[in-house]
């Protein structure tokens, strides 16, 4: 009887946990696939934003939001 309980525990609990872990990975993969379609300029903007850096602005409308070394 104990052996059957162990087998049921393995299949009902551990197998379920293993499959739930795989399902959690899928949204990240879809997000990564969407990011591969970006142009190099869009990709650079995302990276600079994540690093907290700013791009150079056009000299015509340079303001406080621009990077200091640009204007």
Curated annotation (Swiss-Prot):
Keywords: Cleavage on pair of basic residues, Disulfide bond, Neurotoxin, Secreted, Signal, Toxin. Coiled coil: none annotated. It is found in: Secreted. InterPro entries: Conotoxin. GO terms for molecular function: ion channel inhibitor activity; toxin activity. Residues 25-53 form a propeptide. Disulfide bonds join 56-66, 57-70, 62-71. Residues 1-24 form the signal peptide. The keyword Secreted applies. It comes from the Eukaryota. Expressed by the venom duct. One of its GO terms (cellular component) is extracellular region. Pfam families: Conotoxin (PF02950). The cysteine framework is III (CC-C-C-CC). Belongs to the conotoxin M superfamily. This is Conotoxin VnMLKM-02. It comes from Conus ventricosus.
């Amino acid at each position: 009887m104990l052996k059957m309980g162990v087998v049921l525990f393995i299949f009902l609990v551990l197998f379920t946990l293993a499959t739930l872990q795989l399902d959690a990975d899928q949204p990240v993969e879809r997000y990564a696939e969407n990011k591969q379609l970006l142009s190099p300029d869009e990709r650079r903007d995302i990276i600079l934003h994540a690093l907290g850096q700013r791009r150079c602005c056009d000299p015509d409308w340079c303001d406080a939001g621009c990077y200091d070394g640009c204007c």
